[in-house]
From Swiss-Prot:
Membrane topology: Peripheral membrane protein
Entry annotated with the keyword NADP: no
Protein name as annotated: Actin cytoskeleton-regulatory complex protein PAN1
Pro residues composition-biased segments: 1311-1406, 1414-1423, 1479-1492
Region (Disordered): 1-175, 240-259, 761-828, 1120-1225, 1237-1492
Gene of this entry: PAN1
Coiled coil location: 982-1022, 1098-1207
The species this protein was found in: Vanderwaltozyma polyspora (strain ATCC 22028 / DSM 70294 / BCRC 21397 / CBS 2163 / NBRC 10782 / NRRL Y-8283 / UCD 57-17) (Kluyveromyces polysporus)
Gene3D superfamilies in the cross-refs: EF-hand
Biased composition (Basic and acidic residues): 1167-1196, 1285-1298
Entry's family note: Belongs to the PAN1 family.
Entry-linked Pfam families: DUF1720, EH
Length: 1492
């Protein structure tokens, strides 16, 4: 489709005169032949491209413009041709009164350039006066409009020409450049030369006008409609010039009628009524004022109107600003692009004068897509932010959600429009008329088509001379609104024309884009003034707009709904100068509720309503918050405040720290003041100031200003002052050389004031008024005074000042006054308490301060004093609490250590396949590894320190590092600077040349670099050592896991942590090493061992016992002995259980072995010697055992005869059983039962159950065994081993008494924690009377009765069986017991003195001796045992030798007193077991047979 706004090439001015006839004819013929083909192509093409509804009315032409049949008058744009007649053809009249359209549809045989004689009144052409100037018409001298022709062969009437002699001319002179109206399709002088289509193309597209149309539609509407207008059939050729021959006037009467209006019911399309635009314009774009200033400077280079920017509003900028930004955006965007590049945007934004840093922040906020280019909404946002900054606002850290959403929505709309535009608007195809744009019309200049203003409708047309050469005419009234183009002179010899006349009413105006679908009313287009034009439907698609009378100067226009589709806006009268317009809601573009609550404004000449003005406050984040009213006028606005007109010096003095700044700086101070001292040391404060990035000189200046007292520390207020000065410098202000009074901390002011007061008080006389120093703070008015509670004044520094100054002055004479600087201490860390007499100051106070103020000051003094005391007490409490907490922590640590030391070790069962010596070696190595690594770490540390010292010696420097690891501290730097300064000054004084050395900084840098290299090397070495330790720990862990069967060493990290001390604190690691070394006994050690360890004199004995226990453990591992259980356990468990418990018995000794081997490496030799001795003892025991067995059998028979002896022997046997239990318990490793009490406990429980008789039983059993019992010797194991002969004699005498001689058990009495065993032997002293027990044993029936009471206290059931079992045993020893035991008793006594622990145990002996008689009632328990034994005693005798052999082979491994336990009580124990399982023979004792 042809675009009338497209640039059509250079159009040269056209002549308006006429050419000779021959030239005109030739031109006509050539033009017709050339343009005919183009016209035909244009018809065919546009008939398919343009509006389909009109195709049914179109008659396709068979020839081009030059070859039309005579019966048709077709125009190049055939798609607009319809069959519907135009009402203008039937009702209009010529000015002269003749009807020119009488033959409108009858003339069908005229040539294209001919005219009918009967169509035009000749008189009209002959009368020159009928030619009037065309002031408002768009045609000058015969400008025609193409009209839609009916399909029938109808000749168009040339409505604009009167008859004249030149009507039959075949050629017309070229037209001069015209400023009249529309040139689109019919310049009469040019019709024979060019087709109407080409003319239309030259002059700006298919623009159609009425001949005398005085209503010009808005230019923007015409621009939009020009893209869709279709050109109708060409007008018939008319001769418009003056005919040169006499025959021409006759031909002039035959002018053909031309259709000048639209012959269609369809609304006319808008046409461009102005001159050709050089560039296409956006449809519906309102006229904008001429761009000036900043925007115009960019827009002068041209505006890119091809950019597709949706018509959307951005709420954060005004509509005017958005229009300006859009113009600026279009002026800088290159063709084919929708974004402005970064360079172009920078060129625009840099002209704002903002700093590049600020512009960079703005760019970051606006470039939402991070593409480096900005779309229009992003550009508008950037310009908005720049304006905000220029007006004093700050750049937001982040865009608010509303603005961000608007920008994103705008960008989405742009993207959618680009996509839809690319699919819906394909590239335009070439048309047959394209060549005419550049070739045929290249000589035509753009023509102004006449913009007739409303004020020119009433101007009458001037008479024109229709003959001869016309003078240049102003062919149109170019108003001020027609783009400022000057009017064109239409020079050239024009023929006389009938330019006025009574033309038929024409459909005038073009249907603008604002009135689609509404038919235009017919208008009178004749030459007379047309005051009453028909109203037309106006407005842009607004169905509610009222039709308006579009004629000239219509005062009473209908009210219209104004605004952009805003239903809430009041209808306004849009006529001329309506004074009283309706009030409208102003504010935002929204409706009703979104108008920011502003008052409705009358948009006419009525006074405006007052509204809140100004910008939203920065702190108000609600974008719709109402604006606050601002003070206006001189004196009320902050701009006119006095401080803005003062000098810069005054402003500097008035500088102060705001409350917000103070709170912020105080928080920073409290963060770094971790010790709550109220002072910040210089390194910390300097480091904080240094983070600001200021240079050193400025920081020094700031420090000198804020460190008022020159103490190298800053109080809270001084720190806040320093931070304020830092920010002041960062903001570009100059630092003062002296602090202004407003910046001096109030604490310093108070102190200075107090000092001055004290000076005055000291120098004043009682009768003379003291000159007191008063400052501004003394007279400062406190608005809160006497209104608010006094606590509000506590936080005001000046009140403290007033307190300290005037309180002195106002106190009654003679009363002591304390001036307290409590608040000062809170900020400065200095507490000032001054007590002085206020007598000399009283006169001054009475002259200055009222009584009420004195009372208030005194009250504030008391409050401050109370606060100070409370603070002091609080600090004291905190100090005491911290000390108590430390003590509590230490106590908890000590208790934890004790608990850890008392916890028993886990019993690990070692792999028996690994040799014992290998286990010892592994334990030794593992215990040695952490020590080695600790030594290696110490050596490595010493090496690194030595390297540093060596570097210092090799490179002496003025700066020496005294910090950790040789680092240089600030103190070292100060010393080095002092030394360098002193050295330079001394050199200057002495006149010596100062040595040119390196600066302190260079020396420090070299030193630090060397130290860093040494540390790095040391770190690498430590890393290598750590890797080695990790590998060793893995090997050790796997090895220990193998040794313990997976019980230990499974977790390598845990093993490394607790065995090697990796990752533990020094104190914890030391404690673990102490545990391992034996300094603190392990949990597996017996309580008796702990008791022995507490006594230094028993340390040696304890170590020997440990050595013997290790030896026995190793023997057990070799399989020589089987561990034996205590009788108490045997009585409750079967032999299978006894075997099962044998294995765990080893583990405690293995554990103790590991702990002891680490600390006692020298015991190996002693162990070897002990082994040899034990082997010899065992051989002797075997031989003696055989002899004793035979002798025992014989003695048993004798014992039966003597009941007394048998009873004593049975009691002794029972006692032996009792003693056996504690020994085994001790050996098994039950830490909870100490050896001594364990021996006594079972008996004591029995005694409790048996009332008083239990004690003698204990004594009896112990007495029977004590003289010969190995346990006594085991406590003195070393002494017993040293005197082997004495020990052997004891055993023999013991076996003579006991019926069960288990000599093989003597090997292992030592492991039975001799300490516990010792008490057991003590009981034996009373055992001597114990023989009485056998008597009750026989009367089994009697025993049951007493047994009943016994059970209650006998809660420990195992204890009861112990005495019961021996009853059978007693018979055997009965015979020897009366004699042997008594003398034997002294033998154990000898060993007792050697052992310290047994000695205290002796006391029970006398008790037992005194109680022997009551022992008899203890017999009752024996019957119980007897009942259990009755069925079992028969079998034992034969099995005795066999049992002995078995016991010999098994008991070598026992950890308890294998000798004593198995020799005497073993028989009892075996009988106890027999009670549970009769299958086993008791102990081979012969007594059983005699019992039944």
């Amino acid at each position: 489709m042809f675009n009338s706004f497209q640039q059509q090439g250079t159009i040269q001015p056209q002549g308006t005169g006429y050419y000779p006839t021959q030239q005109g004819q030739q031109g006509q013929q050539g033009q017709q032949g050339q343009q005919g083909q183009q016209g035909q192509q244009g018809q065919q093409q546009q008939s398919f491209q343009s509006q389909p509804p009109f195709n049914s009315y179109v008659q396709q032409p068979n020839a081009g413009i030059g070859g039309f049949p005579q019966g048709q008058s077709s125009f190049g744009n055939t798609s607009q041709m319809t069959n519907q007649p135009s009402s203008g053809f039937t009702s209009g009249q010529y000015a002269g009164g003749s009807n020119a359209n009488s033959n409108l549809f009858n003339q069908s045989s005229q040539q294209f350039g001919g005219v009918g004689n009967n169509n035009v009144n000749v008189n009209q052409s002959s009368d020159p006066s009928s030619l009037l100037p065309q002031g408002g018409s768009y045609n000058n001298a015969g400008l025609q409009r193409p009209q839609l022709q009916p399909v029938q062969s109808v000749q168009s009437v040339h409505s604009m020409h009167s008859l004249g002699p030149a009507q039959t001319m075949s050629s017309i002179n070229p037209i001069q450049s015209q400023t009249g109206d529309y040139y689109g399709n019919a310049l009469s002088q040019q019709q024979s030369r060019t087709s109407l289509m080409s003319t239309s193309s030259q002059m700006g597209g298919n623009q159609l006008y009425d001949t005398n149309s005085q209503i010009l539609q808005p230019q923007q509407q015409q621009q939009q409609q020009q893209q869709n207008i279709q050109v109708t059939a060409p007008l018939q050729q008319q001769s418009t010039g003056l005919y040169s021959s006499a025959s021409q006037p006759a031909q002039a009467a035959n002018l053909q009628p031309q259709q000048t209006g639209f012959y269609s019911q369809q609304p006319l399309q808008p046409q461009q009524t102005g001159f050709y635009a050089q560039q296409s314009q956006v449809p519906l774009e309102p006229l904008k004022p001429t761009a000036t200033g900043f925007v115009n400077s960019f827009a002068n280079n041209g505006i890119n109107n091809d950019i597709k920017i949706p018509t959307m509003r951005l709420s954060f900028i005004t509509a005017q600003d958005q229009a300006k930004f859009e113009t600026l955006f279009r002026s800088r965007v290159s063709k084919g692009s929708n974004t402005i590049s970064g360079d172009n945007c920078r060129a625009i934004l840099m002209k704002s004068g903002l700093q590049p840093k600020q512009l960079a922040k703005i760019w970051t906020l606006c470039d939402t897509s991070k593409a480096g280019e900005l779309l229009f909404p992003e550009f508008a946002l950037a310009m908005h932010l720049v304006n905000e900054v220029l007006q004093g606002d700050s750049i937001p850290y982040e865009l608010d959600i509303k603005s961000k959403n608007e920008v994103n929505s705008f960008i989405d709309a742009i993207n959618m429009s680009i996509v839809s535009g690319s699919t819906e608007e394909p590239a335009k195809q070439a048309t047959p008329f394209d060549s005419l744009f550049t070739n045929g019309l290249s000589v035509l200049q753009p023509q102004a088509t006449g913009m007739i203003p409303a004020t020119s409708f009433g101007v009458p047309l001037q008479n024109q001379m229709t003959g001869g050469m016309l003078n240049p005419q102003a062919t149109g009234m170019m108003p001020q609104t027609s783009f400022g183009m000057p009017m064109q002179v239409t020079g050239g010899p024009l023929l006389s024309q009938t330019t006025g006349g009574a033309l038929q009413p024409q459909t005038t105006g073009f249907m603008p884009s604002t009135s689609f679908g509404m038919p235009l009313q017919t208008q009178i287009t004749g030459g007379a003034m047309m005051p009453n034009l028909q109203p037309q439907t106006t407005g842009s698609m607004m169905p509610n707009l009222q039709p308006q009378t579009t004629g000239s100067m219509m005062p009473n226009l209908q009210p219209q709904t104004t605004g952009s589709m805003m239903p809430n806006l009041q209808s306004q009268t849009t006529g001329s100068m309506m004074p009283n317009l309706q009030s409208q809601m102003t504010g935002s573009m929204g409706v009703g509720t979104t108008s920011f609550g502003m008052q409705p404004q009358a948009t006419g000449n009525i006074s405006l309503q007052p509204n809140p003005t100004g910008f939203l406050p920065v702190s108000n984040f609600n974008p719709t918050a109402p604006l606050t009213a601002q003070k206006t006028g001189f004196g009320n606005n902050e701009i006119y405040s006095q401080r803005n007109f003062g000098s810069s010096l005054g402003q500097a003095e008035e500088d102060s720290i705001s409350t917000e700044e103070k709170s912020l700086f105080y928080k920073i101070f409290e963060t770094y003041d971790s010790q709550k001292k109220g002072l910040l040391d210089s390194p910390t404060a300097v480091e904080i100031f240094r983070k600001s990035g200021l240079n050193r000189s400025d920081l020094e200046h700031i420090w000198n200003l804020c460190d008022i007292n020159n103490r190298g520390q800053l109080s809270k207020q001084e720190f806040a002052l320093g931070m304020h000065l830092v920010y002041r410098k960062l903001n570009g202000k100059i630092l003062p050389n002296r602090l202004p009074p407003s910046l001096i901390p109030s604490s310093n002011k108070i102190l200075d004031n107090v000092k001055n007061q004290l000076k005055v008080a000291s120098t004043s006389n009682d009768t003379k008024k003291a000159p007191s120093r008063t400052d501004g703070l003394s007279y400062k008015n406190n608005d809160d005074e006497n209104i608010l509670p006094s606590f509000r004044n506590r936080r005001k520094n000046y009140s403290t000042n007033g307190t300290s100054s005037s309180s002195l002055d106002n106190t009654p004479r003679g009363s002591p006054v304390t001036v307290s600087g409590a608040n000062v201490s809170s900020d400065t860390g200095v507490t000032t308490a001054v007590t002085t007499s206020s007598a000399p100051v009283a006169p001054v106070a009475s002259a200055v301060v009222k009584d009420g103020r004195i009372d208030m000051l005194q009250k504030s003094i008391r409050e401050k004093r109370g606060q100070l005391e409370a603070e002091i007490s609080r600090n004291r409490r905190m100090l005491n609490q911290s000390a108590e907490n430390r003590e509590n922590d230490m106590r908890m640590i000590g208790s934890l250590k004790d608990k850890i030391a008392n916890v028993p070790h886990i019993l690990y069962t070692k792999n028996s396949s690994i040799p014992d010596d290998l286990n010892r070696r592994i334990d030794t190595i593992v215990s040695r590894i952490p020590v080695l690594f600790s030594e290696i770490a110490d050596i490595e540390f010493a090496i690194s320190n030595s390297k540093i010292e060596l570097y210092k010696l090799q490179n002496p420097s003025s700066i020496i590092g005294s910090g950790p690891h040789g680092e240089i501290t600030d103190e070292d730097r100060k010393k080095a600077r002092s030394k360098a300064l002193l050295k330079s000054r001394m050199a200057a004084l002495t006149g010596k040349a100062e040595e040119a050395g390196n600066s302190i900084e260079e020396e420090e840098a070299r030193y630090n670099k060397a130290v860093a290299n040494i540390r790095n090397e040391s770190r690498k070495n430590r890393g290598i050592i750590g890797d080695i330790r990790g590998s060793i720990s893995e090997l050790s862990a796997s090895l220990m896991s193998t040794l313990t069967g997976g019980a230990a060493g499974q977790n390598t990290s845990e093993f490394e942590k607790w065995e090697f001390g990796v990752g533990l604190e020094k104190e914890v690691r030391t404690f673990i090493e102490t545990l391992k070394s034996g300094g603190i006994l392990s949990g597996s050690s017996l309580s008796t061992e702990t008791n022995l360890n507490d006594k230094e004199d028993e340390r040696v004995q304890y170590l020997k016992d440990q050595a013997q226990r290790k030896m026995e453990q190793k023997l057990a591992e070799l399989g020589i002995n089987k561990p034996a259980e205590s009788p108490s356990q045997q009585s409750l468990s079967s032999p299978s259980q006894m075997e099962a418990q044998a294995t765990p018995v080893k583990s405690p000794f293995q554990e103790t072995q590991h702990a002891d081997e680490r600390s006692e490496d020298s015991e190996d030799e002693e162990e070897k010697r002990l082994r040899e001795e034990l082997e010899r003892i065992k051989l002797k025991k075997k031989a003696d055992k055989e002899k004793r067995l035979a002798e025992l059998r014989r003695q048993v028979q004798d014992a039966q005869a003597e009941s007394d002896d048998g009873f004593s022997s049975s009691v002794s046997g029972s006692n032996n059983g009792n003693v056996l239990a504690p020994q085994v318990e001790g050996t098994v490793g039950h830490v909870e039962y100490p050896a001594v009490p364990s021996a006594a406990n079972p008996v004591s429980s029995v005694s409790a159950s048996m009332s008083g008789s239990s004690t003698p039983v204990q004594g009896t059993s112990a007495a029977a065994r004590n003289p010969f019992f190995k346990s006594t010797d085991s406590s003195n194991s070393t002494s017993g081993l040293s005197d082997l002969k004495a020990a052997e004699a004891q055993r023999r005498s013991q076996r003579g008494l006991d019926d069960d001689a288990d000599a093989w058990s003597d090997d292992e009495p030592s492991p039975v924690a001799p300490a516990p065993v010792a008490p057991a032997p003590v009981a034996p002293a009373p055992v001597a009377p114990a023989p009485v027990a056998p008597a009750p044993v026989a009367p089994a029936p009697v025993a049951p009765a007493p047994v009943a009471p016994a059970p209650a206290p006998v809660a420990p059931s195992p204890v009861a069986p112990v005495p019961v079992a021996p009853s059978p045993v007693a018979p055997a020893p009965v015979a020897p017991s009366p004699v042997a035991p008594v003398p034997v008793a002294p033998s154990p006594a000898a060993p007792q003195p050697s052992n310290l622990p047994p000695v205290p145990i002796a006391p029970p002996l006398p008790q037992v001796q005194g109680v022997p008689q009551p022992v008899v009632p203890l017999a009752p328990p024996l019957p119980q045992v007897k009942q259990e034994e009755q069925g079992n005693f028969l079998a034992p005798p034969p099995s005795l030798p066999h049992m002995d052999n078995i016991q010999n082979s098994q008991n070598l491994d026992s950890h308890s007193d294998q000798d004593d336990v198995l020799s005497i009580p073993d028989s009892v124990a075996s009988e106890d077991e027999l009670g549970d399982e009769p299958g086993l023979p008791p102990s081979g004792i012969p007594p059983p047979p005699p019992l039944p």
